């Protein structure tokens, strides 16, 4: 048997030095952004009972959950999602609070992936939820809050798509498709597989009908700005579908009027987890990353499964993908190389610690040199790209940033 003590499990990773500092700073920026606009932070345990996630229409399959047993044989899981524990907390501990309730969180989730697919199994999410409020203002609020928070991290090149599962459901309700066939079609549309969509509709035209076929055939192409809504309206007379489109238009208008229209798009072909989400859905992308920057939507039925039937909406930002999307200039700002190493001879060691304390109080990073002479201290700074040396013996900075800040 191979000894694995020097290895880590597939899908996990060690985060070191600069990357760790940048990630921590991003988490703090997001966290403070939420708190500053009225969100209260909560934390749920990493371990939850499997029953918490064994729900009707749960979007995360049990095959993706890491499972283990407690000392009484009960099944536990490493939480694969943050929203479901929020629903549990709200239904069991927060019934007497004033609603709407605005909650935020930052934490790791764990999802098992197929072998050798290159995906991370431990993901850091930072998210917000608004519970107990069905107004469109709540959906707009979470999108606007997320946009503002992401902008504060320094990321500018990103988009958030708005979808509407009720539009797809309304069109499907006019067909005679069985649930299994509906799921196949949904998957083709979600993945923008145009040829498969066309093939499926032609093969099942007698069950779908001419009017619905026209809408469903165009659904993968209904992507872009506000004009997408007008195109969709011209394709159907279904009243529920028209009402669903109105919500998309109204949400788009609110976000645009708030000054963030350049960051949003509409994608009516975004139809993931149609039995979990109950209306508007959101998904964010950033230049240079293949996976979602954020995801979320309205999930009015979730809390009812915990015995507390109230509406809810929210989203989660993938912190790891956000960090990966940052350009070098932003990363430099998040990981300052303006550091000091304070040197002092052995007889003046107390001066070194006094100098470090003073520099720290001024908001500067500083550390005491562990070396016995200044030459070894200089070498240490060059190798670690530390910008300045402060000599506590002389009270002078003897290494300039322009020289020792570059290797």
UniProtKB/Swiss-Prot annotation:
<dbReference type="GO" id="GO:0140096">
    <property type="term" value="F:catalytic activity, acting on a protein"/>
</dbReference>
<keyword id="KW-0963">Cytoplasm</keyword>
<comment type="similarity">
    <text>Belongs to the class-II aminoacyl-tRNA synthetase family. HisZ subfamily.</text>
</comment>
<dbReference type="GO" id="GO:0006427">
    <property type="term" value="P:histidyl-tRNA aminoacylation"/>
</dbReference>
<dbReference type="InterPro" id="IPR041715">
    <property type="entry name" value="HisRS-like_core"/>
</dbReference>
<comment type="pathway">
    <text>Amino-acid biosynthesis; L-histidine biosynthesis; L-histidine from 5-phospho-alpha-D-ribose 1-diphosphate: step 1/9.</text>
</comment>
<keyword id="KW-0368">Histidine biosynthesis</keyword>
<dbReference type="InterPro" id="IPR045864">
    <property type="entry name" value="aa-tRNA-synth_II/BPL/LPL"/>
</dbReference>
<dbReference type="Pfam" id="PF13393">
    <property type="entry name" value="tRNA-synt_His"/>
</dbReference>
<dbReference type="GO" id="GO:0000105">
    <property type="term" value="P:L-histidine biosynthetic process"/>
</dbReference>
<keyword id="KW-0028">Amino-acid biosynthesis</keyword>
<dbReference type="InterPro" id="IPR004516">
    <property type="entry name" value="HisRS/HisZ"/>
</dbReference>
<dbReference type="GO" id="GO:0005737">
    <property type="term" value="C:cytoplasm"/>
</dbReference>
<dbReference type="InterPro" id="IPR006195">
    <property type="entry name" value="aa-tRNA-synth_II"/>
</dbReference>
<dbReference type="GO" id="GO:0004821">
    <property type="term" value="F:histidine-tRNA ligase activity"/>
</dbReference>
<comment type="function">
    <text>Required for the first step of histidine biosynthesis. May allow the feedback regulation of ATP phosphoribosyltransferase activity by histidine.</text>
</comment>
<comment type="subunit">
    <text>Heteromultimer composed of HisG and HisZ subunits.</text>
</comment>
<protein>
    <recommendedName>
        <fullName>ATP phosphoribosyltransferase regulatory subunit</fullName>
    </recommendedName>
</protein>
<dbReference type="InterPro" id="IPR004517">
    <property type="entry name" value="HisZ"/>
</dbReference>
<dbReference type="GO" id="GO:0016740">
    <property type="term" value="F:transferase activity"/>
</dbReference>
């Amino acid at each position: 048997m191979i000894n694995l003590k020097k290895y880590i499990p597939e899908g996990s990773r060690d985060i070191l030095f600069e990357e760790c500092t940048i990630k921590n700073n991003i988490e703090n920026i997001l966290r403070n952004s939420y708190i500053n606009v009225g969100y209260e932070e909560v934390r749920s345990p990493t371990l939850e009972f499997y029953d918490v996630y064994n729900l009707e229409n749960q979007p995360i399959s049990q095959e993706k959950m890491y499972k283990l047993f407690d000392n009484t044989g009960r099944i536990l899981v490493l939480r694969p999602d943050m929203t479901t524990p929020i629903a549990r907390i709200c239904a069991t501990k927060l019934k007497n609070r004033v609603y709407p309730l605005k909650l935020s969180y930052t934490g790791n989730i764990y999802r098992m992936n197929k072998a050798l697919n290159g995906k991370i199994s431990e993901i850091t999410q930072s998210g917000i939820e608004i519970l107990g409020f069905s107004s469109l203002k709540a959906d707009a609020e979470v999108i606007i809050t997320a946009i503002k928070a992401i902008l504060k991290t320094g990321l500018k090149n990103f988009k958030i798509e708005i979808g509407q599962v009720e539009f797809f459901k309304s069109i499907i309700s006019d067909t005679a498709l069985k649930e299994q066939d509906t799921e196949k079609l949904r998957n083709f549309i979600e993945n923008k597989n145009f040829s498969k969509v066309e093939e499926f509709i032609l093969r099942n035209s007698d069950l779908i009908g001419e009017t619905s076929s026209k809408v469903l055939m165009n659904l993968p192409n209904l992507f872009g700005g506000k004009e997408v809504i007008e195109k969709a309206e011209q394709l159907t007379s279904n009243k529920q579908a028209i009402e669903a489109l109105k919500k998309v238009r109204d949400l788009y208008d609110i976000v645009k009027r708030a000054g963030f229209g350049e960051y949003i798009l509409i994608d009516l072909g975004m139809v993931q987890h149609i039995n979990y989400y109950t209306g508007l859905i959101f998904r964010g992308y950033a230049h240079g990353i293949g996976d979602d920057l954020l995801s979320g939507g309205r999930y009015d039925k979730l809390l009812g499964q915990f015995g507390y039937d109230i509406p809810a909406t929210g989203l989660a930002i993938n912190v790891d993908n956000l960090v990966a999307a940052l350009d070098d200039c932003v990363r430099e700002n998040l990981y300052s190389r303006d550091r000091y190493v304070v040197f002092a001879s052995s007889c003046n060691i107390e001066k070194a610690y006094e100098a470090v304390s003073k520099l720290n109080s001024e908001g500067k990073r500083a550390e005491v040199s562990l070396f016995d002479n200044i030459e070894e201290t200089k070498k240490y700074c060059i190798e670690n790209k530390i910008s300045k040396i402060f000599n506590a013996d002389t009270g002078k900075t003897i290494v300039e940033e322009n020289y020792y800040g570059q290797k």
